[in-house]
UniProtKB/Swiss-Prot annotation:
Organism of provenance: Nitrosococcus oceani (strain ATCC 19707 / BCRC 17464 / JCM 30415 / NCIMB 11848 / C-107)
Oligomeric and partner information: Part of the 50S ribosomal subunit.
The entry's keywords: Repressor, Ribonucleoprotein, Ribosomal protein, RNA-binding, rRNA-binding, Translation regulation, tRNA-binding
Keyword set includes ATP-binding: no
Family per record: Belongs to the universal ribosomal protein uL1 family.
Task of the protein: Binds directly to 23S rRNA. The L1 stalk is quite mobile in the ribosome, and is involved in E site tRNA release. Protein L1 is also a translational repressor protein, it controls the translation of the L11 operon by binding to its mRNA.
Family annotation (PROSITE patterns): RIBOSOMAL_L1
Any Pfam family hit: Ribosomal_L1
Keyword Flavoprotein found: no
InterPro entries, sorted: Ribosom_uL1_bac-type (IPR005878), Ribosomal_uL1 (IPR002143), Ribosomal_uL1-like (IPR023674), Ribosomal_uL1/biogenesis (IPR028364), Ribosomal_uL1_3-a/b-sand (IPR016095), Ribosomal_uL1_CS (IPR023673)
UniProt-recorded name of the protein: Large ribosomal subunit protein uL1
SUPFAM superfamilies hit by this protein: Ribosomal protein L1 (SSF56808)
Domain of life from the UniProt record: Bacteria
One record GO biological process: translation
Length: 231
């Protein structure tokens, strides 16, 4: 812990309090200070000008990052018949229905993403208390309940991120790894920001993208100058 403390102090010494950093400089700083023994994720937090207490201002969506997330995504699919075969051909790790539900109930939940066809929701709906707290419950608003299960599997495997505003109106997600080139991270960030712009609630007033902060898994946040965003 002492080594980590010294590292964080060293990182903070490189940052100017209150400064908004151009996105490229912020990403270069994150890559420069990423020296822990494992490959860190590059994470983004976006403060949105919404009131998440109002149901029509909850922002929820998904984005396929053009350069992926830099990790293997395990996908489980609840479906049957021709959809089951299509899901397997698309690369799903586990496909099933009642049998997969029993696996989940037993505590074996080795998935990053769970997808379901609409006809499977009669089974998946019973798993809400297990999947919901883990952020794995399929939802049509983010494309994980769909008739095109093969397409959803392909997107998930390609590095699709899903997000929803928290109680403070903030979106959190990863945009890649510190090993990525800066241009690749910028392209991923651009895709996310563009999609967030399309999801602006009609009832939201004032500034929509209020603040954007970049960080690594073990590092402090760096506030980004939005004028430098690659959009």
């Amino acid at each position: 812990m002492a080594k980590l403390g010294k590292r964080l102090v060293g990182i903070r010494e490189k940052l100017e309090p209150g400064k908004l950093y151009p996105v490229e400089e912020a990403l270069n700083l994150l890559k420069e200070v990423a020296k822990v023994k494992f490959e860190e994720s590059v994470d983004v937090a976006v403060n949105l000008g919404v009131d998440p207490r109002k149901s029509d201002q909850v922002v929820r969506g998904s984005t396929v990052l053009p350069n992926g997330l830099g990790k293997t995504v395990r996908v489980g699919v609840f479906t049957q018949g021709v959809n089951a075969e299509a899901a397997k051909n698309a690369g799903a790790d586990v496909v099933g229905l009642e049998d997969l539900a029993e696996t989940v109930k037993s505590g074996q939940i080795d998935f990053d993403v769970i997808i379901a066809s609409p006809d499977a929701m009669r089974v998946v709906g019973q798993l809400g208390p297990i999947l919901g707290p883990r952020g794995l419950m399929p939802n049509p608003k983010v494309g994980t309940v769909t008739t095109d299960v093969a397409g959803a599997v392909t997107k998930a495997k390609a590095g699709q991120v899903r997000y929803r505003t928290d109680k403070a109106g903030i979106i959190h997600c990863s945009i890649g790894k510190t090993s990525f080139e800066v241009d690749a991270l910028k392209q991923n960030l651009r895709a996310l920001v563009e999609d967030l712009g399309k999801l602006k609630p009609a009832s939201a007033k004032g500034i929509y993208l209020k603040k954007l902060t970049l960080s690594t898994t073990m590092g402090p946040g760096i506030a980004v100058d939005q004028a430098s965003l690659p959009v």
